[in-house]
């Protein structure tokens, strides 16, 4: 009964006040900057963010296509690595292209005025999360291809397992902390899959990575390429796990912001009265002046 009641998005207004503070009324407090702004010109300036689509398209679609058609054109790493980047990009191309279109639509729609600050805050937070998702999927062909080229399939699988560990501590545990704050409860440690995964990675993660890298330089069991990678390829092989760590860290913090924005939106009438929010901030300067006439 208690488990059904205490849902992450099911807290009451009084309970939500434990995580929603008055700094949510400032761009710094929202942690999403101008994406929460009620000013038209601030939102219009965010159209410059669409320039990032040129980079994400180049890295996620154009580069893999070029390497798949002519893997010999790559100079920094081996031809086999270039071919692997191209193959991964081929399978992810529809997802990357869809993410670019979705992000573009969301940025353009962000220009239009929202009903009030609560709507803009929730929309802006979702927009930021979509940007992180776009960056994540657009860089996968490059980072996955470089990792497989450097360490091989076996080592990449080990890095995937470690990614699951990062999801556990940077996303799931963060959500549990927010839920515990909402209901003022102590987190109960249970032996779920996350605990088992954490214990496994702590005990055997380093050993597995070491053995899988050693396999890449010696026996090459289960590998497509039998050639040994160079020094630059070895260094690039850590790009996937490093980049995914940063993205998951950012995503975890943005999901916290999303939960706060959700409750601020859900109880917007109560929070407007609770924080004594003026018309100018709630509706924006232009609409507030129009309403005052």
Features from the language model and the residues they span:
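Loop-to-transmembrane boundary segments
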Residues: 31-53, 188-212
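Alpha-helical transmembrane segments and their membrane-interface junctions
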Residues: 54-59, 130-156, 206-232
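N-terminal juxtamembrane cytosolic/stromal segments of multi-pass membrane proteins
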Residues: 1-43, 262-293
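Alpha-helical transmembrane segments
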Residues: 80-95, 145-168
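C-terminal transmembrane-bundle signature of multipass membrane proteins
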Residues: 200-293
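Juxtamembrane inter-helical linkers in multi-pass membrane proteins
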Residues: 172-194, 265-278
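Perimembrane loop-to-helix junctions flanking transmembrane segments
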Residues: 65-87
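Membrane-water interface of transmembrane alpha-helices
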Residues: 9-17, 59-67, 95-110, 161-182, ...
């Amino acid at each position: 009964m208690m488990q059904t009641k205490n849902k992450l998005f099911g807290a009451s207004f009084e309970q939500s006040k434990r995580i929603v503070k008055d700094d949510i009324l400032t761009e710094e407090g929202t942690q999403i900057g101008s994406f929460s702004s009620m000013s038209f010109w601030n939102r219009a300036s965010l159209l410059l963010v669409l320039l990032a689509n040129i980079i994400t398209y180049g890295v996620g679609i154009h580069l893999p296509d070029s390497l798949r058609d002519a893997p010999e054109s790559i100079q920094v790493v081996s031809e086999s690595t270039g071919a692997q980047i191209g193959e991964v990009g081929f399978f992810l191309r529809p997802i990357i292209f869809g993410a670019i279109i979705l992000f573009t639509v969301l940025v353009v729609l962000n220009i239009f005025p929202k009903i009030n600050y609560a709507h803009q805050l929730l929309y802006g937070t979702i927009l930021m999360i979509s940007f992180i998702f776009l960056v994540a999927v657009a860089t996968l062909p490059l980072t996955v291809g470089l990792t497989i080229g450097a360490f091989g399939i076996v080592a990449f699988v080990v890095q995937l397992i470690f990614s699951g560990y990062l999801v556990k501590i940077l996303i799931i545990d963060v959500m549990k902390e927010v839920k515990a704050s909402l209901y003022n409860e102590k987190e109960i440690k249970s032996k779920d899959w996350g605990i088992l995964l954490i214990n496994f990675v702590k005990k055997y993660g380093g050993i597995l990575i070491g053995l899988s890298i050693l396999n890449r330089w010696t026996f090459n069991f289960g590998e497509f390429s039998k050639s040994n990678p160079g020094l630059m390829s070895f260094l690039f092989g850590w790009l996937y796990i490093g980049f995914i760590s940063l993205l998951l860290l950012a995503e975890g913090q943005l999901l916290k912001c999303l939960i706060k924005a959700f409750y601020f939106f859900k109880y917007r009438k109560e929070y407007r009265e609770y924080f004594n929010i003026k018309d100018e901030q709630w509706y924006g300067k232009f609409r507030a002046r129009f309403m005052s006439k």
